[in-house]
Amino acid sequence: MSAAKIKKGDKVVVLAGKDKGKRGEVLKAIPKEGRVVVQGVNVVKRHTRPTNTAAGGIVEKEASIHVSNVAHEDPKDGSPTRVGFKVLEDGRKVRYAKRSGDVIDG
């Protein structure tokens, strides 16, 4: 399996769907299904039954969207960019924005 290009905590832009153009942070990545949960994107209403600990009612929460419908936010100017991998001089393998060449993670 290839390395994950989008991980938890990344800043992304939605490219397609009802929330096209929205920006947010990845709350959860689901690599086996190829899906991500993005903060404030694809919000759905869930009807929950009351339990001993929690009250019932209608709860809004983010549903997952397919990873192909999101792109990384370029660290330099905030526009959508593709992600590549490169090995630095010290031997670390890092993700970088193909648009600007900036390193995404540390």
From Swiss-Prot:
A GO cellular component entry from the record: ribosome
Gene Ontology molecular function: rRNA binding; structural constituent of ribosome
UniProt key word RNA-binding: yes
PROSITE patterns assigned: RIBOSOMAL_L24
Swiss-Prot/TrEMBL keywords: Ribonucleoprotein, Ribosomal protein, RNA-binding, rRNA-binding
Family membership noted in the UniProt record: Belongs to the universal ribosomal protein uL24 family.
Quaternary data: Part of the 50S ribosomal subunit.
Function per UniProt: One of two assembly initiator proteins, it binds directly to the 5'-end of the 23S rRNA, where it nucleates assembly of the 50S subunit.
HAMAP family: Ribosomal_uL24_B (MF_01326_B)
Protein name: Large ribosomal subunit protein uL24
Organism encoding this protein: Rhodospirillum rubrum (strain ATCC 11170 / ATH 1.1.1 / DSM 467 / LMG 4362 / NCIMB 8255 / S1)
